Amino acid sequence: MNISVIGTGYVGLIQAVGLAEFGFDVVGIDIDESKVKALNRGECPLYEEGLEGLLKKHVNKNLTFTTSYKPIKDSDVIFLCVGTPQDKDGNADLRFLFSAVEKIKETIDKEDYKVIVIKSTVPVGTNRRVKELLKDYNVDVVSNPEFLREGIAVYDFFNPERVILGFENLNNKKPIEIMEEVYKYFKDKNIPFVITNWETAELIKYASNAFLATKISFINELAKLSDKVKADIKTISYAMGLDPRIGNKFLNAGIGYGGSCFHPDEVLFIDRGRGLECITFKELFELEDKDNVKILSFDGEKLSLKKLKLASKRYYNDDLITLRFNLGREIKITKDHPVVILEDGELKIKLTSDVKEGDKVILPYGNFGEEREIEIDILEELSKTDLIEKVWIHNKDLATNEFNIIKPYLSNKYPHDVKRNGTIRAKDILPIKEILDKYGSKNRLFTAKSKSTTIPYKIKIDKDFARLIGYYLSEGWISKDYGRNGVVRKRIGLCFGIHEEEYINDVKNILNKLGIKYIEKIKDGSHSILISSKILAYVFENILNCGINCYNKNIPPQMFNAKEEIKWEFLKGLFRGDGGIVRLNNNKNLNIEFATVSKKMAHSLLILLQLLGIVASVKKCYNNKSTTMAYIIRINGLEQVKKIGELFGKKWENYKDIAESYKRNIEPLGYKKSDNFAILEVKEIIKEHYSGYVYSVETENSLLITSYGILIHNCFPKDVKALIKQFENNNIEPILIKATDIVNEEQIKWFFEKIKNYYGNLNGKTFAVLGLAFKPNTDDLRESRAIKLIDMLLESGAIVKGFDYVEKARENTINMYKLDKSKGFYGYNLYVLDDLYETVKNVDGIIITVEYDFNKEDWEKIGNLVKEKVVFDGRNILDVEKIKKLGFKYYGVGR
C-alpha cells in the first residue's frame, strides 16, 4: 500500500515515520523546500525521542519527501496533517487544509479511488466540508484525530490508548477495512478502535482535553463546598479515585490546569521587526499585538526565528523546579515542563521532574538570520510622536534650492523666513520628506531655535556609532530637568575616569564626525561628556531602547541584526566602559569580566556573545552591601580572552604578554563545545512551592531559547479555548467549559470571601497574616499570595499585622507599603512585626499564607494572646486535631 502524508510538521512527520516503520511506502509532502531537502538528508527538524533514529532508518528507502503533489496520484491513502492554528479567540485557521484539498483535486484522477484521512485538529463539520469539495471525486474522507503528547509523541504513536476513526457512512465497509489495514499493528496489540461518524470523531479530540481541565476545575470547585460542610478534600479525592468509573487522575485540588509553564520572570527573546528583544514571559503575554512576533529558537543547525503560535497564563499552586547548570545558568519551570536533554549524541525530551544531576543541556551559538546595514530614519520615527511638533530642520541649501517645492507645505506666517534662515518645521516637510535625501547629512534636526545642538536626520549604525552605543550602555545616562516655563530638557551624559583618554577621545571624535555639540566637565578624577539634545535622548531611549540608567539598560534590538563587524565594535565600546581584565594565578592567566545590574542587559549580552561564538559564565550577587542584584559575566579560555581583550585598545597592551605566555591553549571551563552549541550539565535541582501565575508559549517548531541562552521545549497546548469557540459558533453557551478557566482564576478571591463570610463585616477587624513572601525562607514579594490577600483585607477596612521569619521580607513589605499608600498606611492600618507572638496579640483571626512549619510554635501561648481563637490555614499546614483541642476554630482549604 502506498501512502502520502501532506504536511511534515509535528503531527505529519511522526505519522510519516511511524507508517514507514509499519512497512508502508510513504511520501511526505511539504511546501518548504529547505525542510524537504533536510528531511531527505535524514535531518530531523523536531526533537522527539526516537524520531530522528526512525527517520534515518527509513529515509530514501521506503520513506521520501518532496514538494510535489504528483506522488499522491499513486497513493492509496492520503493523510492531511497540515497546520490549523488557532487565533486568540480559539478559531481554527483552515486555509492550509483547504489549500491542500485544492491541490489534491488538481492532481488526482476523478475515477481513481482514494482514502483521504484528516489528522489535523479541525472543528466539527470540517470533514463534511472537505467531502463536499471533493464531491465529484471517487474518494472517502476519514476523520482520524491525533492524541500525541509533546515530548513522548513517538511513544504515543506506537502505543495509543485508542484509535478514533470517523466515516461518512458506517455501512460503507471499504474505507473502514483500508484504515484497519493501515493500523493493523494496533489491531494486533488489541488497542481499542472507535468506529464512528465524522462529527463524533472530530469532537472527541477537543472533548478529551477539555474534560481533563473540567475535571480539575470540578475538584477545585468541590474544595469550596468541602470547606463549607467541614469535609476533607484530600480524602474525598482519594475515595473518588478508587471508583473505576472515575479514576484517580487529575483530582488534586488547587493545582489547576494548563500544562507546562515558565515562571513569569524567566525571559525569552522575541523579534517584532527591529531585532531581538529580551522580554519576560509575563511581558510577552501582556503585549497587545502578538500577531507578528517571532521567537528565537534553534533549527538543529543554527539559531533561527520561529513564529509565536500562542501565549497564555494560568494560576499555579504547586512546586516549581529550578534547574541550575554550569556557568551560573539556570531556568525555573513547572515540574511537568519538557526539557531538551542531550543524550548519546541526540537531543531528547524529559519532563522536569525526571531530570537528574549530570543530565546535559545545550546553548546554541552562531549567527541567525540575515545581517544587514542598519540606518535610523530619525525624522520618520519622530513623525509618530508628539515630539514632532517641537522639531525643526535646518538646511540652508535645501531651503534655498527647493523653496518653490517646499513653500505650499509651510505653516509659517511669513514663508520667506524659511528661505532666509534655512529653518523649517519638521512636520511641514513630512509630506515631501523624500526631498531631504538629496542633501544627506546637511539636514540637521533640533528642538530649540538657537540650534545649539543639532543631529543628522538619519544616522547609520556604522562602526563609530556602534561604539558610541556601547559606551553609552556602560558609562552613560539620560537626565531630565526643566527650563523656563516648565520646558522639559533632556541631556545625555557619559562619564569616564580622567585616565581613560583613549576612550574619551574616541567618543569626542565620534560626536565631532556626526556634528553633535557637547560640553566637557572634569572634576574629582572624572571626565564627563554632556550632550543637550532632546532628540538624541529620544533616539537612545525610545528608538534604540537602550534605557536611561544602569537599572534598565539593554542592548538595542537593531544590534542583533547588524553585521558581525558592527557587533564587535559595539562590544568594544561596551567592554571599555564596564568591562575589566582580571589577572589570575599569580599573573599567569586572565579572564574578562563585565558587570551590570540590569537583568535584561545581562541576558541580552550572553545571547549576543553566543551569536559571535563566545560562551561566558554569569554570577549573580549583591556587591558592597547593595540590595540590587548584580550580574557578573566572565569570559575565560585563551582564544575567547584574546578576542575580547583586544577590544580594550591600548589597555590590552598591559595584559597581552600574559596571554602570549600561556604554556598551553587553555580551553574554556565549565562546558564542552560542539560545532554549533555548547554543552552544559545540570549541577543542582531545587524544588520550591509557588502560588501565582505561570506563563506558556507555543512556537512553530516547539523549541525556544530562554533565560541565559538555554534551549528548551515549549509548553504543551490545551484545547479548552478552541472548544469554547466551537460552542459559540453553534450558538450554544459553554457554561461548564468556560467555568473551568474561571474556577482556576478565583481561588484567592474565594479564600478571602471565606474569611469575610465568617465575620460578616471586616471593617475594624484585626488579623495576623503569617508569612509575607511568595514562599518560605525568601524576601521576594513578587507574586506573593500574602500581599494580594493583605490588599483585599485593607480594602475592606481591616487592620493587618504581618509577620515573616525572614527579616528582609519584613523590611520589603514595610518599604513597599510606605511607597504605595493607595491601599495601606503603614503605622495606621498596617503593621509588620519582628515577633510572631507580638503579631498575634489581640487579633480577631490568624491567617496562614506561607508554608512555614507553624506547628512548632507554642499554640497554647498563642491561644492566650489572641482575641478570638480562629485560624484560616491557606496552606493546610497545621495539625488540625492539635489546634482544635486547644479550642481554635480551624478553616483550611477543602478541609
Curated annotation (Swiss-Prot):
Species in which this protein is naturally found: Methanocaldococcus jannaschii (strain ATCC 43067 / DSM 2661 / JAL-1 / JCM 10045 / NBRC 100440) (Methanococcus jannaschii)
Domain of life: Archaea
GO biological process: intein-mediated protein splicing
DOD-type homing endonuclease domain ranges (all copies): 468-614
Family designation: Belongs to the UDP-glucose/GDP-mannose dehydrogenase family.
SUPFAM superfamilies recorded: 6-phosphogluconate dehydrogenase C-terminal domain-like (SSF48179), Hedgehog/intein (Hint) domain (SSF51294), Homing endonucleases (SSF55608), NAD(P)-binding Rossmann-fold domains (SSF51735), UDP-glucose/GDP-mannose dehydrogenase C-terminal domain (SSF52413)
GO MF, one example: oxidoreductase activity, acting on the CH-OH group of donors, NAD or NADP as acceptor
EC number: 1.1.1.-
Modifications after synthesis and translation: This protein undergoes a protein self splicing that involves a post-translational excision of the intervening region (intein) followed by peptide ligation.
Key word Zinc present: no
Gene3D superfamilies named in the record: Cytochrome c1, transmembrane anchor, C-terminal (1.20.5.100), Hedgehog/Intein (Hint) domain (2.170.16.10), Homing endonucleases (3.10.28.10), NAD(P)-binding Rossmann-like Domain (3.40.50.720)
Protein name: Uncharacterized protein MJ1054
SMART domains in UniProt: HintC (SM00305), HintN (SM00306), UDPG_MGDP_dh_C (SM00984)
Top EC class for this record: oxidoreductase
Magnesium recorded as keyword: no
Keywords, comma-separated and alphabetical: Autocatalytic cleavage, NAD, Oxidoreductase, Protein splicing
Binding site for NAD(+): 2-19
Active site as annotated: 261
Lineage: Archaea, Methanobacteriati, Methanobacteriota, Methanomada group, Methanococci
InterPro entries: 6-PGluconate_DH-like_C_sf, Hint_dom_C, Hint_dom_N, Hint_dom_sf, Homing_endonucl, INTEIN, Intein_C, Intein_endonuc_central
Pfam families: Intein_splicing, LAGLIDADG_3, UDPG_MGDP_dh, UDPG_MGDP_dh_C, UDPG_MGDP_dh_N
